[in-house]
A protein has these predicted regions:
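Membrane-embedded beta-strands that build the outer-membrane beta-barrel scaffold
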Residues: 1, 33-41, 49-57, 141-147, ...
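Single conserved hydrophobic/aromatic residue that forms the stacking wall/gate
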Residues: 2-13, 306, 313-316
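Outer-membrane beta-barrel and related beta-rich outer-membrane complex signature
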Residues: 6-7, 11, 60-73, 164-189, ...
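Flexible, solvent-exposed coil segments and beta strand-coil junctions
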Residues: 11-20, 118-126, 205-218, 276-281
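C-terminal beta-signal and terminal closure region of outer-membrane beta-barrel proteins
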Residues: 14, 21-30, 75-97, 179, ...
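Conserved small-residue
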Residues: 23-29, 33, 40-135, 175
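Short loop/turn motifs that connect adjacent beta-strands in outer-membrane beta-barrel proteins
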Residues: 42-49, 62-67, 240-254, 308
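Extracytoplasmic gating/loop element in the C-terminal half of outer-membrane beta-barrel translocons
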Residues: 161-253, 257-259
Length: 316
């Protein structure tokens, strides 16, 4: 007995056996440089001035994205958030997207002419589609000085950050509920001034247009440029001949140290270093950050002479 079987196989349904896959999302170009200059402008037997300057800058550009990606959202993008971090061809890492005021061809804000929001600015970018800034600075600089006179030493450190934008959702939330200083002043005046235009509907402006985490991102973007006195320390080292007379002490140094003393210049009404986190998806975002700590400290550094072996045994 012979059994004969014949089968035909048509096209197989091309369903991929996975929900997600990893791809090389794009091509990002980074270009940067760093310069450090050390100098001793003054050097005498009693007085010395040493200084060091560090200057750095970095630029990045998204050259290409994966063929299936028009943009890559790597931060919050829901309706309840007024910003999104996106990668777009031609853009940069750190670009912040959100909502902005509608503007005419000359760059002037367009105002609504009818409805409940008549007289209030028009807004575009629902879904966070308008680029409103980039969190990265154009450059950063640190400059320190050390002045020494006999046993005294004074150290100063200046930090300068130039450029970059930061979004304050703290200010947006406070404005929404009318508990910020700017809303109090606006209520007292009876109007808000927006780029030279007077708006009489103060409550409507803050509550219905710009305020809150779903408000106008552009309105709460601040320049992160700042110059601060980062650290100051004053040291005094006692003369060696004084220490020798004690027969116990080898060195004795007293020091006063202060950090985050003050800003010499800043545009934002808060510390631009107070970002939500250092992760890529939260660069340049400030949300109810704790105030910067200013620390003051005093230290005493003591070193002792080594006791002789027979003296050590005698005291044991």
């Amino acid at each position: 007995r012979d059994d004969v079987e014949s089968r035909g196989l048509g096209d197989v349904y091309k369903r991929q056996p996975y929900a997600y896959r990893y791809v090389n999302a794009g091509d990002i170009q980074n270009r940067g440089w760093e310069l450090t200059v050390d100098a001793t402008p003054v050097l005498t037997p009693d007085f010395t001035w040493k200084t060091s300057l560090n200057f750095s800058s970095n630029r990045n550009k998204i050259k290409e994205l994966h063929e299936e990606l028009k943009e890559l959202v790597y931060g919050p993008s829901s309706f309840s958030s007024s910003y999104a971090m996106k990668l777009v061809k031609g853009g940069s890492i750190g670009d912040i997207y959100g909502k902005a005021f509608v503007r005419d061809a000359e760059g002037n804000i367009v105002y609504q002419t009818e409805g409940d929001h008549k007289g209030l600015p028009a807004v575009e970018g629902e879904g966070n589609t308008i680029k409103v800034g980039n969190a990265n600075p154009r450059f950063i600089m640190g400059w320190n000085h050390t002045f020494s006179y006999k046993g005294f030493s004074l150290y100063l450190l200046l930090d300068w950050r130039y450029g970059g934008k930061i979004l304050s959702q703290t200010q947006a939330e406070m404005d929404l509920y009318g508990v910020s200083q700017v809303t109090a002043l606006a209520r007292d005046r009876g109007y808000v001034t927006l780029e030279g235009q007077q708006i009489d509907n103060v409550k409507g402006f803050y509550k219905n247009i710009v305020g809150g985490r779903a408000g106008v991102t552009e309105y709460y973007m601040y320049d992160a440029t700042n110059l601060r006195l980062r650290e100051v320390s004053l040291n005094y080292t006692f003369p060696k001949k004084w220490m020798q007379k004690t027969k116990v002490l080898k060195d004795l140094q007293l020091a006063f140290v202060a950090r985050n003393l003050c800003f010499l210049y800043k545009k934002a009404p808060f510390d631009p270093d107070l970002v939500l986190s250092t992760g890529n998806d939260n660069q340049g975002i400030e949300v109810f950050g704790m105030p910067t700590t200013r620390s003051l400290g005093f230290t005493v550094t003591v070193s002792y002479t080594h006791l002789r072996a027979h003296e050590t045994r005698r005291h044991l």
